[in-house]
Amino acid sequence: LASDLQNGKIAVLGVAYKGNTGDDRESPAYEIIAKLKKDNYEISVWDPHVANEEYVDLNKATKDASLVLILCDHNEFKDLDYDLIKENMKKAIIFDTKNIIKDVPEGIELYNYGNLYSLN
């Protein structure tokens, strides 16, 4: 998936080690971010629970991004502003590693890691 990105910007949503907390100590998200940076991707981060002046809001994080990468299961990520995401991205792609998103509107590609929602 990463090799097919249109440009080198990835919007990372969530760096806390656990959903709905502000604790990012020893979070695996930082290892993922470091790997992506090493591979020359530009990274923008939005985490509404972690205080860091470098972290931006959803609008700035997704502006001109090629991928939204959800790494934490904060409640805020369950109902994102999909219109804003579509407006900010040339091709809106979301990769949800926490399986917190069930559906997205038309015009957004959603990839869930191990999605079990379709099983009834």
Label every model-predicted segment.
Residues 1-120:
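Structural/interface elements that position substrates and couple domains in central-metabolism enzymes
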